[in-house]
């Protein structure tokens, strides 16, 4: 870890929504707050949440596949370190008995939470979810680097985001 260990997560046993991402970015590592960057700003818009709601651990759990910033590679941040999730993920998720909705961001989180669909493209997973919504929602990473994907898939904003906001509101209202 180029910047040293600084595990970042947010979790309360009463959380209704789990956000399963990749790993903290450089800005989040520096601030000590998950999604404290442009990706977090975009994600909060997607979910229809204010910053205070998003960072309320009694509502939202944020548990990335890698808890620490992994460093930067040729095309952005490196993937989460491979030893992290196998060591702690399952016991940590067991502490979230009230999770009603899991939002899965990025390829590594998708492989963990939707292992039977690891070979499917994100577009295929999202179209399947639109056809038959489940409590596990695959999402693109909200990074500004994914702008090209968003432009190639305008149906994401038109169809997925309204339903996503509805599901988020329902999960939080059940509290």
Where are the predicted features?
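Generic C-terminal helix-cap and adjacent flexible tail
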Residues: 166-175
